Regions:
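Conserved alpha-helical elements of sugar-nucleotide-dependent glycosyltransferases
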Residues: 14-22, 216-220, 353, 357
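Structural motif
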Residues: 78-80, 187, 270-271
Length: 368
């Protein structure tokens, strides 16, 4: 019996996408996986990641090219998986798949987004019907209820095949339940977000958040020194995956820097420090106090401060402005883990779930 083909339609791929986005799980369950990168069509991607794994990867540069490939693939009857928090990017292509007798699913596995998702969800629920209701996905695999904000109508939002699961951060949490930090001592964890050189600055066409590096580095240095002096604990830096070591040393000096172990190190941290990293999901899961900081340059950049405020409002958190003087007591800015229950709804639909996201997905794909 020939393996059934899965076409994973993504903006781009990263070093660990094969694990995070289920490609390995699909292959282990007998599926043939092919990846189509469409970031040039959705977010204007200009810098592509180099594939780090053996799956076929095709970069698609136009809607015409995408439609042509869907037509050619119709003979093989693949399952299409669209990896987006909003399902509306490729409505016509999804309708074409259904008209050709094919099947597709939407996959939304990411954390809470940067826009007012609640407002979007209200708009969806106020729209009784949409033409795409005639071409619904076989399944919508959603990380949380709020991800229905990317659907088209109240009819689709109440669709019986909306499968509520959890975010990929919850997958990491499940994998790291029995892990232990190698730090060997108490520490405070700082979530680096690579504000100086993140490729999204180019890919998304947003203005650079940090325009004066010297001022930014001085403000971060003062914050970390204050934390270490007040608490008598070292600050460990959880590096962003896109950060280069040279820049990290320039910002954080001789402090310990860890890569790819943010979940593990959050579990064993005293508390964490962040501007608005998606990694706060780990802090919420492990009920760690969070210190949110901002600065003049962040507050005056694109939508990022809005993104931070959304998270802080849900967590009832104060934000420490490190561009002002740092004479206040940091303890007054730490979040209270008792306020995390509401935020948990953005991380998982079932706190008792022990299965990984794509283990659940495969069970449904096997029925198609």
């Amino acid at each position: 019996m020939k393996s059934r083909r899965i076409i994973c339609i993504v903006n781009d791929i990263w070093e660990n996408s094969d694990e995070v986005w289920g490609f390995n799980t699909f292959r282990e369950n007998g599926y043939c996986v092919e990846i189509w990168r469409v970031g040039a069509l959705t977010i204007g991607t200009k810098i592509w990641e180099k594939p780090q794994f053996s799956y076929p990867v095709i970069t698609i540069e136009s809607k015409k090219e995408l439609d042509s490939k869907i037509l050619k693939m119709s003979l093989y009857k693949p399952i299409y998986l669209f990896y987006f928090s909003e399902s509306k990017y490729f409505d016509k292509e999804k309708a074409l798949i259904k008209l050709l007798g094919g099947k597709y699913c939407n996959v939304s596995i990411g954390p809470l987004g940067s826009r007012d998702n609640h407002l979007q969800l209200r708009e969806v629920m106020s729209r009784k019907r949409h033409w795409m209701d005639n071409f619904l996905a076989t399944y919508n695999f959603l990380a949380a209820e709020i991800h229905k904000c990317g659907l088209h109508s109240k009819f689709e939002a109440e669709y019986e095949n909306n499968i509520m699961i959890h975010t990929y951060d919850y997958d990491y949490y499940l994998r790291n339940q029995n892990s232990k930090s190698k730090c060997g001592k108490e520490y405070i964890l700082f979530y680096d977000q690579n504000f100086l050189e993140h490729k999204d600055i180019i890919n998304y066409g947003i203005k650079r958040r940090i325009t004066n590096e010297k001022v930014y580095i001085k403000e971060i240095s003062n914050l970390l020194l204050k934390i270490e002096m007040e608490y008598g604990l070292p600050v460990v830096i959880a590096a962003h995956p896109t950060s280069k070591n040279a820049n990290l040393k320039k910002i954080y000096g001789s402090r310990e820097i860890i890569y790819g172990k943010t979940c593990e190190y959050t579990k064993n941290a005293k508390w964490v420090v962040t501007c608005a990293s998606g990694a706060i999901n780990y802090a919420v899961l492990y009920k760690k106090p969070i210190l949110f900081w901002t600065c003049y340059q962040i507050k005056n950049s694109d939508i990022y401060f809005e993104w931070q405020c959304i998270r802080c409002n849900i967590l009832k958190a104060k934000i420490l402005d490190i561009s002002d003087n740092l004479k206040g007591n940091i303890q007054n800015y730490l979040t209270n883990p008792d306020n995390y229950e509401k935020f948990m709804n953005y991380i998982t639909s079932n706190p008792n779930e022990k299965r990984l996201f794509f283990d659940i997905v495969v069970g449904y794909l096997n029925k198609m």
